Each structure stands twice: as C-alpha cells, then as structure tokens.
Amino acid sequence: MTIAKMIDHTALKPDTTKEQILTLTKEAREYGFASVCVNPTWVKLSAEQLAGAESVVCTVIGFPLGANTPEVKAFEVKDAIQNGAKEVDMVINIGALKDKDNELVERDIRAVVDAAKGKALVKVIIETCLLTDEEKVRACEIAVKAGTDFVKTSTGFSTGGATAEDIALMRKTVGQNIGVKASGGVRTKEDVEKMIEAGATRIGASAGVAIVSGEKPAKPDNY
C-alpha cells in the first residue's frame, strides 16, 4: 500500500472556505488519498466532488471536545452519512474516562458505532495528550469492546498530537485486527514512517501533499 492510500487528507480549521475544500478534494483525486477529513458542514460538497473517486469522505463527530451526549453524537453520524460520509472520527467523553465512568464512555462510543453500522467506518479519538498511559489503554480497550474499527490519537486541537510511543501502546492494546490512526503534528514523510513503524495503519494530516511529494509544508498545522 502506498503512503497516499494511508492518509486522511485533512481540513478541519473553523475558517476553512469552500475554495479550500475544492482544492482538498481535487488533491485527494490527484494523489489517491484514503479520504478527505472535513467538518460536517463540508461533507455534502466533498461527497459531490469525490463522486466516482477512490477517496471517500470522512467527517468528525463530537469534535473537538467530545463533550456532547451520546444521542447528539448518534444524530451527527446519521446526518453525516445522509450527506455522503463513509468514515466518521468521533471524540470520546474524556471527562467520563477520567472519572472512570467506563459505562458512559462505552455507551457514548456504541451510540456512534450503532448509528454508523454497515454504512460508515468508525474511528475513536482518545486525545492521548490529555491521558495517562493507564487511561490510554483503558480508552482503547473500551473502544474495541464497543465495536470501533479504529482508535485514533488526537484531534489536533488540544495540547499535543501523535507520538510513536502512543501509537505503539495503542497497537499493543488493540491487537492486529483494529486500525490505529496517528494524527496531530504529522507533517513529513519521516514522521509518517515513524508512525507506521510504531503500528499506525492510517495517518491524519493537513500536509498530505507535502508528505507524498517530499516538499516542505507551506504552513504547518496542528493536524
């Protein structure tokens, strides 16, 4: 598999414009990225632009704080699928995890998994920069139990992004049958190679073109 096919080509900034989305989808077609990852408001346009392409549309749920209710997250998923999303990246209830309310964390993830069943792949963002190693392991275990397809490191909107150490810990926890996505601060081909070596099977990056072309990113983003 080429590096491009492992990348979710990402534009999640709040000030993203239509022109930037059109560029993003054009680049996805050109380079063959796995997906474009966009905010829910851009799902429909992105799906229209990628009709017939190998790249699919990924969107974010409960993003970036994860502090919505399970019911709201489930509605977001259904709306996104209706608009053409084929993958959804949800943020867990981080406070509940820290409170050791494993039941709520699982119910929250399961609401998204159930809403997406048979229609969209689910990635669970655990926001590693806010967690202890014990919490990272517990978050991954709960996500697997709830039926996720992937676990993912970061939103790119908190205090830190992906590290090879976290990817290795997540891979060790979930085993070989669940995907692991590295996102947040992955900007170069070298960064990507480190993450893949540690166990990542998907990369979230706004610097996708720079990564596959070997050029320096014009303007580094957090994700």
UniProtKB/Swiss-Prot annotation:
Keyword Lyase: yes
Keywords: Cytoplasm, Lyase, Schiff base
GO biological process: 2-deoxyribose 1-phosphate catabolic process; carbohydrate catabolic process; deoxyribonucleotide catabolic process
Active site: 89 (proton donor/acceptor), 152 (schiff-base intermediate with acetaldehyde), 181 (proton donor/acceptor)
CDD domains: DeoC
InterPro entries for this protein: Aldolase_TIM, DeoC, DeoC/FbaB/LacD_aldolase, DeoC_typeI
Reaction(s) catalysed (UniProt annotation): 2-deoxy-D-ribose 5-phosphate = D-glyceraldehyde 3-phosphate + acetaldehyde
Localisation: Cytoplasm
GO cellular component, as recorded: cytoplasm
UniProt key word S-adenosyl-L-methionine: no
Top-level division of the source organism's lineage: Bacteria
One example GO MF annotation: deoxyribose-phosphate aldolase activity
Pathway assigned in UniProt: Carbohydrate degradation; 2-deoxy-D-ribose 1-phosphate degradation; D-glyceraldehyde 3-phosphate and acetaldehyde from 2-deoxy-alpha-D-ribose 1-phosphate: step 2/2
Leading EC class: lyase
EC numbers for this chain: 4.1.2.4
Family the UniProt entry places it in: Belongs to the DeoC/FbaB aldolase family. DeoC type 1 subfamily.
Function: Catalyzes a reversible aldol reaction between acetaldehyde and D-glyceraldehyde 3-phosphate to generate 2-deoxy-D-ribose 5-phosphate.
PANTHER family, per database record: DEOXYRIBOSE-PHOSPHATE ALDOLASE
Protein name in UniProt: Deoxyribose-phosphate aldolase
Protein source organism: Listeria welshimeri serovar 6b (strain ATCC 35897 / DSM 20650 / CCUG 15529 / CIP 8149 / NCTC 11857 / SLCC 5334 / V8)
Gene name of the encoded protein: deoC
